[in-house]
Swiss-Prot record:
Entry protein name: Protein SOB FIVE-LIKE 1
Main localization, broad class: cytoplasm
Source lineage: Eukaryota, Viridiplantae, Streptophyta, Embryophyta, Tracheophyta
Tissue: Predominantly expressed in the vascular tissues of seedlings, developing leaves, flowers and siliques, but barely detectable in roots and stems.
Biased composition (Basic and acidic residues): 1-10, 111-128
GO biological processes: cytokinin biosynthetic process; cytokinin metabolic process; cytokinin-activated signaling pathway
Subcellular location: Cytoplasm; Nucleus
Knocked-out gene: effects: Plants missing both SOLF1 and SOLF2 have reduced endogenous cytokinin levels and accumulate lower levels of trans-zeatin riboside monophosphate (tZRMP) and N(6)-(Delta(2)-isopentenyl)adenosine monophosphate (iPRMP), biosynthetic intermediates of bioactive cytokinins as well as decreased response to exogenous cytokinin in both callus-formation and inhibition-of-hypocotyl-elongation assays.
UniProt note: domains: Domains SOFL-A and SOFL-B are required for function in cytokinin-mediated development.
Motif (SOFL-B): 75-84
Organism: Arabidopsis thaliana
Function: Involved in cytokinin-mediated development. Together with SOFL2, triggers the endogenous content of specific bioactive cytokinins derived from the biosynthetic intermediates trans-zeatin riboside monophosphate (tZRMP) and N(6)-(Delta(2)-isopentenyl)adenosine monophosphate (iPRMP) such as N-glucosides trans-zeatin 7-glucoside (tZ7G), cis-zeatin 7-glucoside (cZ7G) and N(6)-(Delta(2)-isopentenyl)adenine 7-glucoside (iP7G).
Length: 148
């Protein structure tokens, strides 16, 4: 593997060993060392590949870099793990739904726990009343048996 290069920083600055060739390629493009029109946004979740606006206009007044009807070769812009960009909004919605779903599960568990505590309180009150009434029955039987 090629050793990490310094891209416009001081000579003392070093890159970590986990930096990939893609990162260096993208940094070159970003800092103007390359004429590439591809920018990769590598967040914690997914990698997104976007075409950057380089500000140059084509002969027909269009600012895109596609060269007319020609199909662009963006094999260098993505890897096998990245899917079509139209899947990103679905993933975000699923993530938000999953996040809200976990809140809903938490609230349901909390409500269930509160109901259980409430039911246990009612059960203990019922047991206390039952004990009191059973004790009073025993006392009343004792009185009845003494009178006979």
């Amino acid at each position: 593997m090629e050793s990490p290069r310094n891209h416009g920083g001081s000579e003392e600055e070093e890159y970590s060993s986990c930096e990939s060739g893609w990162t260096m390629y993208i940094e070159d493009a970003f800092h103007g060392n390359d004429q590439s029109s591809v920018v990769v946004d590598d967040d914690d979740d997914d990698t997104q590949v976007k075409e950057a606006d380089d500000g140059y206009e084509n002969d027909d007044g269009d600012t895109s870099d596609d060269g007319g009807d020609e199909e662009s070769d963006d094999s260098m812009a993505s890897d096998a793990s990245s899917g079509p960009s139209n899947q990103l909004p679905k993933h975000i919605n699923k993530h938000a739904a999953r996040k809200n779903g976990s809140k809903q599960v938490y609230l349901q568990k909390r409500q269930h726990t509160e109901k259980t505590i409430s039911n246990e309180g009612e059960k203990s009150d019922l047991k206390a009343r039952t004990r009191t009434s059973a004790a009073s029955r025993v006392q009343s039987r004792g009185k009845v048996s003494k009178t006979k």
